[in-house]
Amino acid sequence: MSTTSCRMYENRFPEVDELVVVNVRQIQEMGAYVKLLEYDNIEGMVLLSELSRRRIRSVQKHIRVGRNEVVVVLRVDKEKGYIDLSKRRVSPEDVVKCEERFNKSKAVHSIMRHIAEKHNVPLETMYTTIGWPLYRKYGHAYDAFKLAISNPDHVFEGLEPPKSGVINDLLAQISRRLTPQPIKIRADVEVTCFGYEGINAIKAALKAAEDVHTEEVPIKVKLVAPPLYVLLTNALDKSLGLKKLEEAIGAIEKSITASNGTCTVKMKPKAVSETDELELADLMKKFEKENAEISGDEEDDQSGSE
């Protein structure tokens, strides 16, 4: 048996009405031949009549070779190995639900395959001794793996791994790959105050924003270049992070308007990528350099006038 290939689920064939993810291999007159990615690439067919509810003028508009599709199982002949599938009976909600399950199954499969190769154990043996029992107990092995990060003894209790060291290595892989990573969230605001309190009012408003922080959602305010400031946080819960930055902006607005100042939101709170972070760092360096050059010019002017 192979250490790299095996179906993801215990049943060798999908059930009728089950949603599955397929990869389109070729398109013929009868329909599209596909491989069921969760079932070790066994072959299935989507008849042309099951591609779309609308009249088909161009097959390529509905299905393309090489692309993954979510389809539903219509018929299964286990003896002959025939699997008939439909794309037109799949709703947008079905697609979201199926892709979510597939992504979880794919993550589990990658971890299981890594351990199987490392210990030279057939991948199917890994599934029969660990993977599928966890599917039965927890609904999905991915959910069991996530729970194992904090409570491994409870999750793996009663399992009989094929070799010693498998569970420890499995847990190490789970912790490395599935431990939640903080999401970087950012908002940009312009804060000005030309009233009597001026810069002190701005400082107080920015401090009010940082005071909104919690242990789960720390908040920092950084100057880019007056009057532009960025609000930054790292949060495991994206929605909570966004909500807290909204609250921080509200705190700025309340504080600064009390001093006859203004707060203008230039970018609403959003999750940012590494590229966004690098662009921000470059922008801040640029303004630091410009400020240093201005300071140098002022010093030269003062020394020249003496």
UniProtKB/Swiss-Prot annotation:
GO terms for biological process: cytoplasmic translational initiation; translational initiation. Transmembrane segments: none annotated. GO terms for molecular function: guanyl nucleotide exchange factor inhibitor activity; methionyl-initiator methionine tRNA binding; protein-tRNA adaptor activity; ribosome binding; translation initiation factor activity. The modification Phosphothreonine is found at residue 179. The keyword Signal does not apply. Disulfide bonds: none annotated. Keywords: Cytoplasm, Initiation factor, Phosphoprotein, Protein biosynthesis, RNA-binding. eIF-2 functions in the early steps of protein synthesis by forming a ternary complex with GTP and initiator tRNA. This complex binds to a 40S ribosomal subunit, followed by mRNA binding to form a 43S pre-initiation complex. Junction of the 60S ribosomal subunit to form the 80S initiation complex is preceded by hydrolysis of the GTP bound to eIF-2 and release of an eIF-2-GDP binary complex. In order for eIF-2 to recycle and catalyze another round of initiation, the GDP bound to eIF-2 must exchange with GTP by way of a reaction catalyzed by eIF2B. This is Eukaryotic translation initiation factor 2 subunit alpha. The lineage of its organism: Eukaryota, Fungi, Dikarya, Ascomycota, Taphrinomycotina.
